Amino acid sequence: MTPRRQQRPKGQLAKAKQAKQPLARSRRPRRRRRAAITQNNLMMLSEPGLSFLKCAFASPDSNTDPGKGIPDNFEGKVLSQKNVYTETGVNFSGATTQNVDTYIIVLPTPGVAFWRCIKTATAPAQPAALTTTDVFTAVPFPDFTSLFGTTATNRADQVAAFRYASMNFGLYPTCNSTQYNGGISVWKGAVQMSTTQYPLDTTPESSQLVHAITGLESALKVGDENYSESFIDGVFTQSINGNAEFPFYPILEGVQTLPGQNVTVAQAGMPFSLDAGAATVAGFTGIGGMDAIFIKVTAAAGSVNTATIKTWACIEYRPNTNTALYKYAHDSPAEDIIALQQYRKVYKSLPVAVRAKLNANMWERVKRLLKAGLVAASYVPGPVGGIATGVQHIGDLIAELSF
């Protein structure tokens, strides 16, 4: 016989229910306290912080506002800019009998949109790999001379230092989908400036200060972490600051080529050279703390590969006090820890590159990452969790500032 389950007497059951009620009530004040977190605490993700994120990640198709600057612990006058370069009808194809490889490097060089080198070979041969004899030429932003002048020795007359928030590059095909033939590969790599005192074989003996860029060897081979697609898919990619801080870097003067005169590419330890061209058009103004973006576009003989190139950079300068630009400078925004944390989160979350058509939704993707990050932060104990709790208000703030 199956034993009967013992049942609690009705009186005891009622007492048990009554005993649970105070526990349920005790949770309510905590919920009320969470809901009552003031808007001031939530504003730790500030409007300048959101403007900084928008400048760094949003396409200038919608907004070219450079924001208020980078909201870190720097205190001083800054000049924020969002430089934009657009080139339409770019032909990546060669003659009907030529295979063409176009190399583009987006470097953190103020005033320069990107550096380009084109290599060709008569079909069926493929273009040779990059060597020390190859030269990358500068493609400047339209306002280069207004900020850096027309002589190499006066580059720092207006601004003394700079730092980047982001660099962005987009290639948008405009050719017929039945006529193209080729592909696009994108990868990234660390680059840095090196400066050495190089001895010269002269009488009497002398030396020369030589600038060079280390890390350009990454351009010689497609990196393991890469984006590779058909040319017709295009590409959008960006680089942001992965360093712990946002240091300023000096504007260089008197540099038009890397390496400089009297020093060979091999002696400087570079895989190829950079040439900014005429000083009245462009120049080499320095290297910031961002990873370089390497792009290789291939086109087969007889193909019709045309596209629009659009690149932009969110950058901050320290203007000289004796210039007219100084009156347009503003105080660097107060530190916004939440905005900087979300900037790092986006840095870790975004892929090397995406298809060009996905660029239109870039800011929407960033907003989703922001909301997800703030939701996760609301479960963190301490001040960060307290600030992030009530994420619905942050979402409303983001929505108000969205495009």
Curated annotation (Swiss-Prot):
Bias type Low complexity, positions: 9-24
Keyword Hydrolase belongs to the record: yes
Residues binding Ca(2+) 1: 157
S-S bonds: 55-314
One of the record's GO molecular function terms: metal ion binding
Recorded GO CC terms: T=3 icosahedral viral capsid
Positions bound to Ca(2+) 2: 157, 217, 269
Binding site for Ca(2+) 4: 217, 269
Region annotation (Disordered) ranges: 1-32
Domain of life: Viruses
Site residues, Cleavage: 359-360
GO BP: proteolysis; symbiont entry into host cell via permeabilization of host membrane
Active site per the UniProt annotation: 61
EC number, UniProt record: 3.4.23.44
Binding locations of Ca(2+) 3: 157, 217
Keywords: Aspartyl protease, Calcium, Capsid protein, Disulfide bond, Hydrolase, Metal-binding, Protease, T=3 icosahedral capsid protein, Viral penetration into host cytoplasm, Viral penetration via permeabilization of host membrane, Virion, Virus entry into host cell
Family note: Belongs to the peptidase A6 family.
Protein's name in the database: Capsid protein alpha
Source organism of the structure: Boolarra virus (BoV)
Lineage: Viruses, Riboviria, Orthornavirae, Kitrinoviricota, Magsaviricetes
